[in-house]
Structure formats: structure tokens, C-alpha cells
Amino acid sequence: MADGANVADVVVVGGGAAGLAGALTLARARRSVLVLDSGSPRNAPAAHVHGYLGHDGANPAELLARGRAEALGYGARIRSGAAGTVVAADRVPGGGFLVRCGDGSVVRAGRLLVATGLLDELPPVPGLRDRWGRDVLHCPYCHGWEVRDLPLAVLATGPLAVHQAGLWRQWSDRVTLLSHTWAPGRDERELLAARGVEVIEGEVTGLDVGTDDRLAAVVLADGRSVACRALVVAPRFTARSGVLTGLGLPEATIERGGRVVGTCVDSDPQTGATALPGVWAAGNVTAPMEQVAGAAAQGVRAAVAINTDLIEEETRRALRAGRGDAG
């Protein structure tokens, strides 16, 4: 049995925007909350957060530090490192969960809010991971303004590249699609031409980074270089859903253009409730395309739903006690 320090109304798994927003909301609702944070936020490589009203341009690490301080200020508890890494979670007969952590500790939770995020799996091109979030990009709403009017290249690994090229064309009139492992057909080329996007054939084998530590070009297999200051890629989204699959909730697949581009956890879009009673999900683990502001909003909505669920359970328990019902 977990001791008093290891018992919480709600355990929040994940200390990013969704998890901390949920923890803050629950703590302000006078719930005992424990955040388990392994310390690997999705946007760690990025220098700034954009599109978050009141926080545009904030450093991601500093934004999370402020969020932790706010949640702690209302009584939430936060564990990081091994103590914040969830190894497994098991349902307890009669209600609640036992959450096992990397340091060997066990936490008893009445409800779970899973906000573990996802992993971005990049195409296997040398150098991409080192530049990810800097000048190897995915979301124009996160980074488009910073590379506006610069020469941009889109790494084509599937039909989604046509959509990406047309979208990024909003921020620059110098967009090139590179037929890396997928070449557009006649209809796609017509669409690209209508948007003013050039198509260059050839597999990308590397990146050329200038002395200013900025991307200067991509290198093709035949030795040609294509100048660009940012490279747009389509990562595969892999949900960090181990704690949920361990409880029996399978992953769902994400499809774009008839192709599977990742995995996520299904949850109610309004409340975050999953098919598992007592378990909610918020943020990129359930909505891979969500930005920081949206992930935080999901955390708040899930927290409200969890608090409501706890109130209903407490009311039922009080009714049974008043009637002298057993159990």
C-alpha cells in the first residue's frame, strides 16, 4: 500500500503544457495532484514558443519552469527524473490505480491524466536530428514567420509533401519540393506549379551547414546542392502511450493521404476521457498536431472533467453512507 506521500486524487503523467495546465487547474480545485515528469518535452529543441497569446516568443524551458512554479504554488507536487518516470500502471480492484515509477516508488491515484506527448521520428537523412526545431521544421504556424521570404525546401517522403509545399508557400515565394523518396504525379505537379513551387528530382543525402551554424543547402545523391535556409519534413508521430497500452487501451493510427503517419490515443475531444474508466488524456499524445496553446487548453478541459467525475463519485459515496448501504 502506498504511504501518504504517495497518494493523490489525480496523478498527471507528463509535465509539458497539457500536464501542467491540468495540474494547475486541479490544484486550484483543491485536489491533491502529483505530476510525474520524465523531463523530455517534445519542443525541447526549439528556441521559442509561438502563437501562445501572452507568451509569444517565450523560451520553452522557461515557460515550463513558470508553469511548474504556478502549479506548485497551489499545492501540486512534481517529481522528475527516475521518480517521475512511469514504468507501469495497474488498476486497483475497487477503484483507482497503482503507478510504478523508475525509482521503485509506487503511487496510489484515484484518477489518471496522461499527457505524455509524442516522439517525432524523422526521415533517415544524416544531420536532420541535429537541426530539428531550428531549420529542419514541420509546422509553419510555429516557425513560418521566422523563415519568411527565405528559400525553403520540402523533403518529399509521401503525398503529404504536396500539401506541405502549398502551405509553406504562404510564408515564402521560394519553395522547392525535393522528390526524396516520393515523386509527385502529373496532377500533383499541376497543383505545385499553380502555387509557384518548383520540383527538383533527386534523393537527399545530407545537409550543408554554413559557418554561421545555419542551414545553407541540401546535398543530393548526384552531388548537386539545392540552396535553402530551412528544410520542411514530415515526421512520423509516435505517441508515448506505454502507460495506456499497459492498461489495455490500444493505440490508434493516424492517416494522411491514405498513408499511416503515426499513432495516437483516442479520447473524447471535449473532455479528454478515454475508453478506460478513470483515465483521461490531453496534449500531443491524443492530438499530435496540437500546438502548445491547444495542448494547455486540452489539459484544462480534462482537469475540469476529472474534478467533476470525482465530485460525482464523492456524492454517490456520501449517499450510500447516509443510507447505511454497504460498499
Regions found by a protein language model. Name each.
Residues 2-5, 92, 104-106, 129-131, ...:
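Solvent-exposed alpha-helices and their adjacent loops that cap or buttress functional pockets
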Residues 3, 8-65, 150-151, 160-182:
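Beta1-alpha1 glycine-rich phosphate/pyrophosphate-binding loop at the start
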Residues 7-9, 81, 148-149, 276:
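Phosphate-coordination loops involved in phosphoryl transfer and adenosine-cofactor binding
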Residues 22-24, 162-164, 282-327:
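A conserved FAD-binding loop/helix module that cradles the flavin
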Residues 65-66, 71-101, 106-109, 172-263, ...:
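A Rossmann-like FAD-binding core segment of flavoenzymes
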Residues 130-146, 237-291:
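FAD-site-proximal beta/loop scaffold in flavoenzymes
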